[in-house]
């Protein structure tokens, strides 16, 4: 697998992918070249998770197992993930994305800020939270299934058993994009009775449903889905009082699926950072509703993307 440097690319100081030769942004040539570049981006993001965010790459296996690391999938964790009082779990969607990414297309065509999970990770670390970054699409290597990670759901369940369930966290937060919502719901079927799981923020994920395991919880589980359709004041996004087992819906600040995690970040963290109870739920949700990053053009088309901040590297 080639590196970005070998392919003649680099991320500039604003996180924009440029060519080494003429310092111009990426331009599509062939699908084969694009896929090769995408794999190089995977490696670059992995490196940034370690060098910029201070995360540690961790082989994924069940406790007590002695499998060789090179035969396993892997995740990224913060140094304090076992001991932190608050633990943030990040789960990407389906397809080619890997740990640390929301959307490969945004990383290549826009910048690191909008396409990676780095802004979420850095904000969590600033708060003193522990961080676990799943890698649910890394299921095989050289056409061989990776043990404990043969499917996205098995990967997520193994991460939960190995890293999250035994942690000392008092509150566990999950942010999941797209298919990551299904993976989250699948995990909750087995672990949803854990009252430490307190808030789940989904970004444009239609696949989440409350499992029966959550019915006997002593502590409320707040779930919000930031959707990439409609607009801020659409009737469907009217804030209502808290109801147990309900998935609240808010506008993500965009009508483009892959932009939802980036545009909703301030609203997501307002929910995660605020002490939420059934009594103040509606107030917190109203505040979060107004924090989505909106495009200058409120009538976005598929080709119109919101403006994003830049991330320095």
Swiss-Prot record:
Family the entry assigns: Belongs to the FAM172 family.
Lineage of producing organism: Eukaryota, Metazoa, Ecdysozoa, Nematoda, Chromadorea
Disulfide bonds: none
Listed GO biological process terms: regulatory ncRNA-mediated heterochromatin formation
Database matches in Gene3D superfamilies: alpha/beta hydrolase
Name listed for the protein in its UniProt record: FAM172 family protein homolog Y75B8A.31
Domain of life: Eukaryota
InterPro entries for the chain: AB_hydrolase_fold, Arb2, Arb2_dom
GO cellular component annotations of the record: nucleus
Region (Disordered) residue spans: 293-313
SUPFAM superfamilies (alphabetical): alpha/beta-Hydrolases (SSF53474)
Organism of provenance: Caenorhabditis elegans
Comp. bias intervals (Basic and acidic residues): 296-307
């Amino acid at each position: 697998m080639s590196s970005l440097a070998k392919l003649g690319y680099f991320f500039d100081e604003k996180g924009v992918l440029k060519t080494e030769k003429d310092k111009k942004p990426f331009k599509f040539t062939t699908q084969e070249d694009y896929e090769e570049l995408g794999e190089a981006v995977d490696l670059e993001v992995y490196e940034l998770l370690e060098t910029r965010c201070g995360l540690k790459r961790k082989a994924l296996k069940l406790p007590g197992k002695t499998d060789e690391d090179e035969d396993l999938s892997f995740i990224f964790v913060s140094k304090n993930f076992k001991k932190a009082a608050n633990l943030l779990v990040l789960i990407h969607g389906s397809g080619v994305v890997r740990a640390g990414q929301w959307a490969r297309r945004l990383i290549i065509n826009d910048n690191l800020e909008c396409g990676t999970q780095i802004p979420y990770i850095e904000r969590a670390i600033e708060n003193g939270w522990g961080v676990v970054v799943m890698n649910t699409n890394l299921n095989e290597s050289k056409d061989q299934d990776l043990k404990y990670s043969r499917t996205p759901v098995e990967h997520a369940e193994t991460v939960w058993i190995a890293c999250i369930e035994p942690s000392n966290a008092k509150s566990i937060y999950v942010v999941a994009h797209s298919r990551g919502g299904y993976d989250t719901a699948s995990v909750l079927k087995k672990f949803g009775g854990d009252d430490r799981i307190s808030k789940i923020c989904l970004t444009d994920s239609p696949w989440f449903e409350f499992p029966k395991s959550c019915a006997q919880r002593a502590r409320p589980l707040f779930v919000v889905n930031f959707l990439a359709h409609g607009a801020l004041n659409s009737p469907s996004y009217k804030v209502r009082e808290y109801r147990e087992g309900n998935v609240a819906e808010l506008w993500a600040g965009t009508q483009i699926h892959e932009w939802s995690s980036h545009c909703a970040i301030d609203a997501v963290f307002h929910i995660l950072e605020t002490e939420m109870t059934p009594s103040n739920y509606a107030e917190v949700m109203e505040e979060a509703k107004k924090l989505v990053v909106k495009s200058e053009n409120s009538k976005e088309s598929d080709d119109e993307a919101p403006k994003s901040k830049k991330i320095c590297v």
